Amino acid sequence: MEEMPKNYDPQAAEPELIEKWMKADCYGRSKGTEDRTVVIPPPNVTGILHMGHAMDDTIQDTYIRYSRMRGYSTRWILGTDHAGIATQTKVDKKLKSEGISRLEIGREKFLDACWDWTREYGGTIVSQIKRMGCSIDFNDEKFTMSPEYTQAVRKVFVDWYHDQLIYRGKRIVNWCPHCETSISDDEAEYADEKGHLWYLRYPLKEPVNGVEYITVATTRPETMLGDTGVAVSPQDPEKADLVGKTVILPIVDREIPIFSDWHVDAGFGTGFVKVTPAHDPNDFAMGQTHNLEQINIFDEHAVVVDGYGEFSGLDRDQAREAIVAWFEEHGLLDHVEDLDHSVMHCYRCGTTLEPWLSEQWFVAVDKLKEPAAQVVKDGQVTFHPERWTQTYLTWMENLRDWNISRQLWWGHRIPVFYCDDCGWQDALMEDTDVCPKCGGHHVHQDEDVLDTWFSSQLWTFATQGWPDHPEQLEGHHPTQVLVTARDIIALWVARMIMSSLYFTKEIPFHDVYIYATILAKDGSRMSKSKGNGVDPMDLIAKYGADAMRYNLLTLITNNQDVKFDAVLDKKTRELIESPRTDQARSFVTKIWNASRFVQMNLDGYTAGMPKAETPEDAWMFSRLAKVVAETTEQLETYGFGEYARNIQSFFWNDVCDWYIELCKGRLLDGTPDQRLQVQRNLVFVLDVSMRLLHPAMPFVTESVWDALPASGLLSHDAEFLMISEWPDPEKLASFVDEAAEHNFSLAKTVVSAVRSSRARYRLSPKTDLAVVVKAPAQDVAALKEQAAFIQNVGRVSSLEVAEAPQKPAGSVSVTDAGLEMYVVLGELVDLAAEAKRLQKDLESAKKELSGVERTLANQGFVAKAAPEVIEKKRARAEELTTLVAQLEQQIADFS
């Protein structure tokens, strides 16, 4: 048996293992009686890995590795998204750097440039996913612009078009003047901004009861050029006399009516609301109701169109300034108020979006949303954590028709064709240049492309042969679970459910697992613009993939967001450290060192069954069996954080700190039979532990497992740990021994109390101490039976156990797990001086705690201080509260 190296080097071991696994085709579909198929949320084809991807992919790989070991037929589908706006923006930028514009080279050459870009940079994120250790089938990569996938997208559009679920119409859309395309409601990002509320006077055509003008309040004076009405609330009786009257719109001298409408909030501004149907969704709705003219005053660049004199040619910001100046100059600016309000921005470039009337393609959702809501209500699709169910259902209730057209070139071109000769129009599965109605040749295709989410909504079934080979879906669809972020519950999850129900007549997945958003250390969202994003590849380079993966899993709780503790260089933004990931690396080292110690002491080992020959053996086997059952249940129910924390606590505390330490005597000084049996026991415990740890930390566990001989209970026939068997909870259930666990835990409690007392009073670990234990009647006998063990392991010179013993002089008391232990310190410690010191420390801690609590109770401080400062104060208050309790307990120990 080749000895394990002294140090484990993840940078050398991890890439080597990836190559071995792939060469042996371990990532392909595994065989089993039951299926578990998972689709990876497709990242942008030319993107790079970020922390959200790292969390998502770690969770999926943990689940897939576990399911593969459980014997399921697993399939994890890899693929990338063509990312319409993102890719086109990057190619546009590249061409501009070369002095070229896409308009100059035309659509076809621009698309060639997009394909070149995709081929050049498209493999980056896939290679990064591979470096993480994701056991996904890299030989079967999907792409949303592949010929097969494009046909699926086209069929969905054509079928919905002919089923009258897709229509074209003029609607208010969120228009990005920079990207020159519409953005769906769900893609718009909102930001609070400081703005103004301008009060503008509009003259009445004829005075009413001596009133010559009305005053409207608006945040967007520049759009007044397109006003075609003024609205008041039906619940505002003071303005009833003005309903039906006419206003002369300043600058353009347009006559516009005053009307009442329920959209108006009588308490906003003056109660008079300017109505601009072409530039506001609510105004558009009022315009439809009251038959108002729709006047678009901006072009696609948000520049005022011709026909408005000195204001034409101005962009919207310039127009705002000029129009406000005009109103002020003509005595029609009443006053201006400061206003904080929420403003929509493009998620891609950050430009303020413009509500803009344009002709777009829409999906009518009324017939689609009810079935999609019902499958969640009746439990066919389950959200984890459960609280996201209501988020989904609320969004479905308020769902509006979906704008699916984008004014781009890169993407799935809308397959609608028009005849310029006879006006024929239809959606087709095949391109045509001949009109089927009149035979004319003046046929052209719609210029727009489909929203990226339109194609990605088909991801669970279009990646598996649909529509040409629906038989490939059998046994693999619905998929098992979709792991994704909360940001796209509306954008993607809901639409996947709607389209899958419509086209496959079944749900796309049984479960939806929503993971927490990873925030920067200060609690802000990670982003390129802020420079606070952490590159997962930097973490892997510094700490190894296992450490990063394990740290991410332990971050998972039921909280909505988690802070990542990475420290970045303020200038270069390069990673300096991540203390939690460093702790995870220490766990990797612990696994390696503990396993190496056992492997180095296996001389003369032969495989054989584990057998409990000592109390610690019985305790260990019982704990092991329970942890197998617990981790199995946790992974089955998507409890990834609980699983990771459970297995670490077990392996580090129970296996390493206790069991291996307690086995050293038999391993090093036992009889040949004792030595062989403890070797078998240790190999068995390590074998099971590596299997349990493997889904989270595949590399170090594979390396350890490969270095270990076969245990006598679990099969070691598989070439790799990743395709070996998961420990069967039922087969190990016979190891559970509640009495053995309880009794040994009592002994551990006493030993821990003695050790902690030595540490607390700064005594040498080799100092023998006398101990008296006050125990419940039912535990006295068990403790006495283990007296030799306690005295040997705990370095206890004498041990007394009784129900009601006398507390010895010069002793301190430690209470834990129903036991009261008196540790005799005698002359080893000056108890009076120690008590005095502790009392002084207690008073100091209480004083500081009082000051921190006063600060946190100060509303002025809480209102003005930065969130990270407040969080630091709260953390300090928690630390001091714990310290006060500890000091009070230590002082009480002397009594």
Region spans (language model):
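Active-site-adjacent bridging/hinge elements
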Residues: 32-40, 62, 98-101, 126-133, ...
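Short acidic-hydrophobic surface loop/beta-edge motif
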Residues: 198-206, 245-250, 344-347, 417, ...
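Short, polar/flexible loop-turn hinges at active-site or ligand-entry regions and domain interfaces
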Residues: 97-112, 382-383, 537, 558-567, ...
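Feature 926 captures the class I aminoacyl-tRNA synthetase adenylation module centered on the KMSKS loop
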Residues: 199, 394-454, 458, 502-545, ...
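Short Cys/His-rich metal-coordination motifs, predominantly Zn2+-binding knuckles/fingers
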Residues: 179, 252, 349, 420-422, ...
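Conserved short loop/turn motifs at secondary-structure junctions
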Residues: 5-6, 79-82, 110-115, 139-150, ...
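N-terminal, positively charged nucleic-acid-binding surface of large information/translation enzymes
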Residues: 1-235, 259, 276-289, 293-308, ...
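Structured ligand/cofactor/substrate-binding pocket environments in proteins
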Residues: 52-64, 71, 80-81, 149-152, ...
